[in-house]
């Protein structure tokens, strides 16, 4: 019998490669907990690519069990799921094999079960969970849907997103009430769960970043870059609607203002599955935009950039891309939504801009002023290194999981 209490951690997808913010946050938390108070069993779908991921798996858990993914994410099934009482994203996560695998693991009576993302509650057994239970949320999902409705381009899309928001809010409330503790990734999200959804048992952990992995290497250069052109970078999964919306807004409203003052400036967009429509539109307009698609490591792209831009108008939770760029030494221009939930100070750790005119002006301000670029980059990195290591975040999560567990 293990001397340590057993923790069962259920992820809705295989965690490697770390190609999304959710996977990065989850693996950072698990790495921070590995070797600590718990013996950790990770449960998730099998690796989809058939590659050997044993070393990566061993870095986050003591044991790994899986199920073969049997979800149906076809366009036709997405359309049918609009008629479901569940939000589409939750309906698509339903898996008979997943439910059976989780039920078998719970039957072994671990001391704690953690479900990663609110969607994963659809895989949990009905009725009260048999052991201490923790729900790890990464966003306020219903708020994301509401913001998608706000920025939708036509009445039909707005109506669909509003319907999905209502379904998601109901699902979030019902799911969270089943857990002993709900973990949020920002005080703002925690307040929403308490005040809007009536969830009392909410705890908050900070967002962390591995400052050793994302090593500080600000781009050299003490010049005004507007003449020769600055290199901008955006990182993020390009199959996530808020990222698509943000770049479409940048294309339509702000980019022309930037290149009017700095004609040779270019943008590199680093992230999986860029929509063909967006890529084609950038080419049609002759924009100096490069879409990399999926990359193994974003660091070289951010190191090579002069400014990281985050033109988000929708989304939720906290954006790991912000901390990654700051840790690497790349100054950030962001909307309020882009840094939402992160305890950052505008004009100290990043430059804030809301409308298109201000966003373009903020980018140009950084390109023109090498001292400002250096000051913003250094202050942000120093702040992150002192306060937000993954080990600190992992230990905070561990303490929450230990509550009520006999040691």
Can you say where each PLM-predicted feature lies in the sequence?
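Carbohydrate-associated surface elements
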Residues: 188, 208
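Conserved acidic donor-binding segment of nucleotide-sugar-dependent glycosyltransferases
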Residues: 350-357, 365-371
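Acidic donor-binding loop of glycosyltransferase active sites
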Residues: 180, 300-317, 328-331
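Acidic anion/phosphate-binding donor-loop and adjacent secondary structure
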Residues: 146, 209-224, 279-280
């Amino acid at each position: 019998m293990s001397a340590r209490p057993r923790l069962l951690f259920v992820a809705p997808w295989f965690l490697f490669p770390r190609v999304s913010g959710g996977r990065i946050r989850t693996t950072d938390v698990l790495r921070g907990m590995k070797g600590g108070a718990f013996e950790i069993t990770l449960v998730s779908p099998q690796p989809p690519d058939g590659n050997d991921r044993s070393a990566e798996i061993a870095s986050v858990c003591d044991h790994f069990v899986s199920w073969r993914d049997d979800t149906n994410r076809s366009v036709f099934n997405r359309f049918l799921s609009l008629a479901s009482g569940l939000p589409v994203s939750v309906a698509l996560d339903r898996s008979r094999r997943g439910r059976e695998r989780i039920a078998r693991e719970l039957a072994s009576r671990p001391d704690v079960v953690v479900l990663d993302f609110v969607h994963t509650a659809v895989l949990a057994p009905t009725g009260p969970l048999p052991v201490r239970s923790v729900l790890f949320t990464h966003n306020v999902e219903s708020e994301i849907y509401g913001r998608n409705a706000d920025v939708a381009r036509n009445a039909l899309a707005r109506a669909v997103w509003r319907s999905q928001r209502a379904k998601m809010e109901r699902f979030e409330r019902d799911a969270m009430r089943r857990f002993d503790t709900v973990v949020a990734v920002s005080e703002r999200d925690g307040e929403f769960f308490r005040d809007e959804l009536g969830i009392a048992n909410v705890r908050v952990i900070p967002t962390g970043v591995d400052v050793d992995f994302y090593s500080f290497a600000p781009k050299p250069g003490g010049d005004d870059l507007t003449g020769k052109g600055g290199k901008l970078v955006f990182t993020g999964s390009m199959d996530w609607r808020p990222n698509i919306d943000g770049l479409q807004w940048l294309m339509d409203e702000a980019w022309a203002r930037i290149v009017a003052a700095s004609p040779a400036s270019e943008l590199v967009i680093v992230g999986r599955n860029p929509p063909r429509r967006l890529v084609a539109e950038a080419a049609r307009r002759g924009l100096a935009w490069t879409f990399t698609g999926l990359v193994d490591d974003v660091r070289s792209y951010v190191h090579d950039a002069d400014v990281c831009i985050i033109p988000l108008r929708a989304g939720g939770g906290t954006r790991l891309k912000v901390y990654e760029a700051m840790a690497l030494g790349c100054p950030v221009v962001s909307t309020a939504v882009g840094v939402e939930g992160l305890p950052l100070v505008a004009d100290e750790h990043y430059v804030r801009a809301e409308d298109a005119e201000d966003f373009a002006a903020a980018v140009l301000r950084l390109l023109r002023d090498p001292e400002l670029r250096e000051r913003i980059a250094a202050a942000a990195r120093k702040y992150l290194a002192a306060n937000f290591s993954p080990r600190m975040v992992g230990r905070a999560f561990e303490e929450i999981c230990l509550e009520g567990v006999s040691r």
